[in-house]
Amino acid sequence: MPSLRTRREEAEMELSAPGPSPWTPAPQARVSDAPAVTHPGSAACGTPCCSDTELEAICPHYQQPDCDTRTEDKEFLHKEDIHEDLESQAEISENYAGDVFQVPKLGDLCDDVSERDWGVPEGRRLPQSLSQEGDFTPAAMGLLRGPLGEKDLDCNGFDSCFSLSPNLMACQEIPTEERPHPYDMGGQSFQHSVDLTGHEGVPTAESPLICNECGKTFRGNPDLIQRQIVHTGEASFMCDDCGKTFSQNSVLKNRHXSHMSEKAFRGHSDFSRHQSHHSSERPYTCTECGKAFSQNSSLKKHQKSHMSEKPYECNECGKAFRRSSNLIQHQRIHSGEKPYVCSECGKAFRRSSNLIKHHRTHTGEKPFECGECGKAFSQSAHLRKHQRVHTGEKPYECNDCGKPFSRVSNLIKHHRVHTGEKPYKCSDCGKAFSQSSSLIQHRRIHTGEKPHVCNVCGKAFSYSSVLRKHQIIHTGEKPYRCSVCGKAFSHSSALIQHQGVHTGDKPYACHECGKTFGRSSNLILHQRVHTGEKPYECTECGKTFSQSSTLIQHQRIHNGLKPHECNQCGKAFNRSSNLIHHQKVHTGEKPYTCVECGKGFSQSSHLIQHQIIHTGERPYKCSECGKAFSQRSVLIQHQRIHTGVKPYDCAACGKAFSQRSKLIKHQLIHTRE
């Protein structure tokens, strides 16, 4: 093999030989100008039909009629030979390091394909010895550039022209749809002849690579390796942004692209600031409290919280702020400006964050989920409040009584108990309330609105709490049980009131007479004795009553209804209390005993009346004559003397009496007759 120096001298001699100037432009005959013919691989590789000359130049498997066999010197260079050529070319000079032509293809082509077929001007063709050997000297490579510029050879994949330089090589590395080297087995095509040579060693359909796990066949070893990673579960490629791992590097690259497409940035500085959010590095530390930040701007904003200075002051009310952005938002309160408008319903907001939160009411989006119970919320603040249900945290404490609350709104409402503040006033009757919800419920008295409807019977209620109590009638549920006697109740309030029977606790006292009650409702009813209020009136006779239950019982006199019947004797009563009292006649039960004399009574009212005998008290006084009585019933009978009322008539003779006992005695006269 001739030495490198000898070849360089031969090239220089060729350049100095007399003849036409090598820089004279000559008409270039391109391969694409040759007549086109079809070949078996044209459909598979997707390239247009080629001429015989082009086919032989780019496809070593194609044979012309006069070239039946391929000789050894026409074969493609092995990769080892190419590597050796590259190493030898790199040793020539540092001045020509960037001009090394990686794959010398001209010398690898069939003898019938000359430089003329590649469009090289006759004056710029390489010496025959160099074109056959495939070695290029710097001087010879200079022939291929020259004053014509680096546009003498075409890249097969593009219309642009390049010289034999890194420009052509870089172009040939770009993936393209056109691969001018069709593979005659399977119709595959390749961009470079070296790729085709490497492909010839890939297993064919006759000798595939088979996965031992699933039996799937592959045509390449890399595909088989990736398939085996799927079976082993190995995930060696981790995403730096989200921490997710992947078994293939290509999938990881796609993942990186998805992160980059999620957020767009105006410049490199914005992108760098954004990347600091993913990094755990926080180099900016507050000297006051030690809190660290990833950005210097965030630190500066935070440091203003330690400063008492509030340089941004509102011209309307004088309120000061540490940040100008907070002042701008505040000023919208005075101006009424609401620049952020919902595209769905048209509702406007002063802050963009409020619009984002509001928009979730239309979309139903609830991105904040509780890790304990899975309940989802549309706002992070609502999630934090909810999580206190699980933790039991009650950070807000009343300064007056020490009672803690999980929400600051509940503390504010509670504090009005101590201050007596009632800021919510009814515009119809002037009644004031401490809570807005109480005012809303109260207004339903005036409007008659009953929005809460029972889905079983259709009955409507003004309050949801009353509906819940009503629904227990249908279910029969009594979840509240007394721990002392085992009695069950449908409502917790009823259980609390019942427990006062065992404890003797009567926290509700009358301010007029000092009488105490176990229930607040009983105190309210009792106070009507002092006020004389009787708001419930009978529509039949006009009689009024202090309690609604008493009116209902009275109306049974007019309609004759006696729904409460004794299962022993069949006697019916218009009141359940009268039935209970009557049943003690059959049982002989007298649970109420006088502590003074030991006498027993079936009714508590009878015991109370009896105890007055021992005390000598006469609380019932006649307003006409001033006479006092120990029992209310005796006073009523006495008052008939003054009024002349005789409600008890004899059915036999029609005589009337003021007392029932006198009527009974009179009726004995008729029975004797």
From Swiss-Prot:
Ranges of biased composition (kind: Basic and acidic residues): 1-10
InterPro entries to which the protein is assigned, alphabetical: Znf_C2H2_sf, Znf_C2H2_type
Superkingdom to which the source organism belongs: Eukaryota
Chain positions of cross-link Glycyl lysine isopeptide (Lys-Gly) (interchain with G-Cter in SUMO2): 253
The keyword Oxidoreductase is assigned to this record: no
Function: Acts as a transcriptional activator. Promotes cell proliferation by facilitating the cell cycle phase transition from the S to G2/M phase. Involved in both the hemin- and phorbol myristate acetate (PMA)-induced erythroid and megakaryocytic differentiation, respectively. Also plays a role as an inhibitor of cell apoptosis.
Record-listed N6-acetyllysine modification sites: 478
Zn-finger segments (C2H2-type): 209-231, 237-259, 284-306, 312-334, 340-362, 368-390, 396-418, 424-446, 452-474, 480-502, 508-530, 536-558, 564-586, 592-614, 620-642, 648-670
GO MF terms, alphabetically ordered: DNA-binding transcription repressor activity, RNA polymerase II-specific; RNA polymerase II cis-regulatory region sequence-specific DNA binding; zinc ion binding
SUPFAM superfamilies: beta-beta-alpha zinc fingers (SSF57667)
GO biological process: cell division; cellular response to sodium dodecyl sulfate; negative regulation of apoptotic process; positive regulation of cell cycle phase transition; positive regulation of cell division; positive regulation of cell population proliferation; positive regulation of erythrocyte differentiation; positive regulation of kinase activity
Record's protein name: Zinc finger protein 16
GO cellular component, one term: nucleus
Ranges where the record places region Disordered: 1-42
PANTHER family, A to Z: ZFP14 ZINC FINGER PROTEIN-RELATED, ZINC FINGER AND BTB DOMAIN-CONTAINING
Species assigned in the record: Pan paniscus (Pygmy chimpanzee)
Subunit field text: Interacts with INCA1; the interaction inhibits INCA1 activity and induces the cell cycle process.
Residue segments, region Required for nuclear localization: 332-364, 464-494
Subcellular location: Nucleus
Keywords of this entry: Acetylation, Activator, Cell cycle, Cell division, DNA-binding, Isopeptide bond, Metal-binding, Mitogen, Nucleus, Repeat, Transcription, Transcription regulation, Ubl conjugation, Zinc, Zinc-finger
Region described as Necessary for transcription activation: spans on this chain: 62-210
UniProt similarity note: Belongs to the krueppel C2H2-type zinc-finger protein family.
Pfam families cross-referenced by the UniProt entry: zf-C2H2
